Amino acid sequence: MIGLVGKKVGMTRIFTEDGVSIPVTVIEVEANRVTQVKDLANDGYRAVQVTTGAKKANRVTKPEAGHFAKAGVEAGRGLWEFRLAEGEEYTVGQSISVELFADVKKVDVTGTSKGKGFAGTVKRWNFRTQDATHGNSLSHRVPGSIGQNQTPGKVFKGKKMAGQMGNERVTVQSLDVVRVDAERNLLLVKGGVPGATGCDLIVKPAVKA
C-alpha cells in the first residue's frame, strides 16, 4: 500500500467518550494527484509519482509545467514517489484522498525535523556537564577526550561531537491513527511528528504494525 503526502497543521487534543485526553497531531492531506506511473519495462521498478497542493504559475519551471500538463493535473508544490506492491494499480491523473487510511490502524510519518543550528554535545547528544567548581574553571560543557592513544591514533567516524543539530529527515514509526476526517481532508495521529507547522510530511502504513 502506498502512502500520502500531507502538511503539518499543528497539535491539539481530543477526548474519548470516557473523558481521556489524547494528544494528536493534525495532518492536512489534500488530494494527491498522480503525475506519473513507473513500470518494470521502462523504469526497472514499479512506482507511482504524486503531487499535492498548488504552486504559483510564475514559480513553475518549463520542464515542470510540461510534466504536469502531460499528466493533465494542476501544478503542485512538489513531487513524491511511492513504490507499488504487487496488484496495486493507479492511472495518471487519478486523485487519491485521505480515505486511503480509513482502515489503517498505525502509520509511519516522515518529515524534516526543526533545525537547531550549531549545537554543543550537551544539547545535541545529552552529554553530562563536568564539575561546576572544584578546580574546573574552563571545561564545564566541553566533551572531554575524543580518542584513545597512539593506537588507533585517530578519531573514529561517527564520534558524537558538536555540530549541526536538527534539519534532517526523521521518521516516527507506529503512530496510532485516531481519526480520518475525509470531509476536511484531515488525518489525526496520536503524538508528535517531526518538523515545524506547515512542513510537508510523508504518511505511510506502519511497517511494524
Curated annotation (Swiss-Prot):
Cellular component, GO annotation:
cytosolic large ribosomal subunit
Q: Which SUPFAM superfamilies match?
A: Translation proteins
Keyword Ribonucleoprotein belongs to the record: yes
Q: How is it modified after translation?
A: Methylated by PrmB.
Residues with PTM N5-methylglutamine: 150
Q: Which HAMAP family match?
A: Ribosomal_uL3_B
Q: Which protein family is named in the record?
A: Belongs to the universal ribosomal protein uL3 family.
Name listed for the protein in its UniProt record = Large ribosomal subunit protein uL3
Q: Which organism is it from?
A: Salmonella typhimurium (strain LT2 / SGSC1412 / ATCC 700720)
User: Which gene is this protein's source?
Assistant: rplC
